[in-house]
Regions:
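Amphipathic heptad-repeat coiled-coil/leucine-zipper-like oligomerization helices
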Residues: 53-56, 70, 102-104
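Short, well-ordered beta-strand segments enriched in hydrophobic/aromatic residues
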Residues: 94-103
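Short, surface-exposed beta-strand/loop micro-motifs that present aromatic residues
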Residues: 83-92
């Protein structure tokens, strides 16, 4: 979830993982003298009364802190063609941190474009944490001279790459991100009925744009409506972040729809029409990321 929080860093004061200390209050006869599930430390001799505990050891929750403990710096612009791969990057003097997370239930191929680093790479520190449903998490770290241009990231795996550079890198451009919220929300979806949303006073330029369409619908109806922005049709992707939610009674999620930045005007009209009835469009957000110079 941390990569999702980092996407909203400008809207958070603080975010803290739900991890407690050793929670000695839970080690009682009623609980079979077993530790609380969300603890960072557990007894080395589990199942013993509190007075008989001989020492404390880390639980697997320590891996979260091992994975992220060195990451810091100023945010670097990143993008991904695969919505199931979350990515964040931060630059701190001679260290570039790139974090990747796989939301899909199967391994995903990753191809990193870091050509701008050139021969400035001294080495790369690799950290990986994979969480399994029926087994202990797997954590490892290593330092390598290089990594393949293409590699796979496992389901539920998070990778943090630290590119250790020979000389510091400087920013040559700045990206400004702005979210514009529609005034209409929780709109009932009716077959072939056009839902219209207005976005005014939008600042455009070089960069990228997208629509965040949040919907709640039954599984047997469409998730891909006809979408027009200022009269021009834009493609709705077949894939979105995460899984299909087939184990739930209904689908409820946000589908990101890429929009060519050239279509964005100061005042914009978005029209959405589904081929079938049922459910609601809960909200629609226009995301615009612009820069003074074109993003390479």
């Amino acid at each position: 979830m941390i990569l999702g929080w980092l996407d909203r860093q400008d809207r958070f004061e603080i975010s803290i993982p739900f991890t407690v200390d050793n929670a000695t209050w839970h080690i009682t006869k009623q609980n079979d003298y077993l530790p609380y599930k969300a603890v960072l430390w557990r007894p080395e001799n589990m199942g013993a009364p509190l007075k008989d505990i001989t020492g404390w050891v880390y639980t697997n929750r320590i891996h979260f802190y091992q994975l992220w403990k060195d990451v810091k710096g100023k945010r670097v612009f990143t993008s991904t063609a695969n919505p199931d791969i979350q990515v964040q990057a931060f630059l701190d003097d001679k260290h570039l941190y790139v974090a990747l997370n796989n939301l899909d239930e199967s391994p995903q191929q990753v191809s990193l474009d870091v050509a701008s680093l050139g021969v400035n790479i001294q080495n790369i520190s690799v950290k990986s944490l994979t969480v399994f449903q029926e087994d202990f998490p797997r954590y490892y770290e290593d330092t390598v001279p290089s990594i393949p241009s293409e590699f796979y990231i496992e389901a539920a795996e998070t990778i943090v790459l630290a590119y250790n550079l020979k000389t510091p890198m400087a920013f040559k451009n700045q990206v400004n991100a702005k979210r514009y919220y529609s005034t209409g929300f929780l709109v009932p979806i009716e077959a072939h009925n056009e839902m219209t949303f207005e976005f005014k006073n939008v600042k455009s330029g070089h960069g990228f744009a997208s629509l965040s369409m949040s919907i709640g619908r039954n599984h047997d109806v469409s998730k891909r409506p006809n979408v027009l922005i200022n009269g021009t049709k834009v493609a709705v992707p077949f894939n979105w972040k995460g899984y299909d939610q087939a184990n739930r009674k209904k689908f409820f999620g946000t589908i990101e729809i890429p929009v060519p930045i050239a279509l964005i005007k100061e005042n914009n009209t978005v029209s959405i029409r589904f081929p079938d009835s049922g459910g609601h469009l809960s909200s629609l957000i226009l995301n615009v990321e612009t820069s003074k110079k074109p993003i390479q």
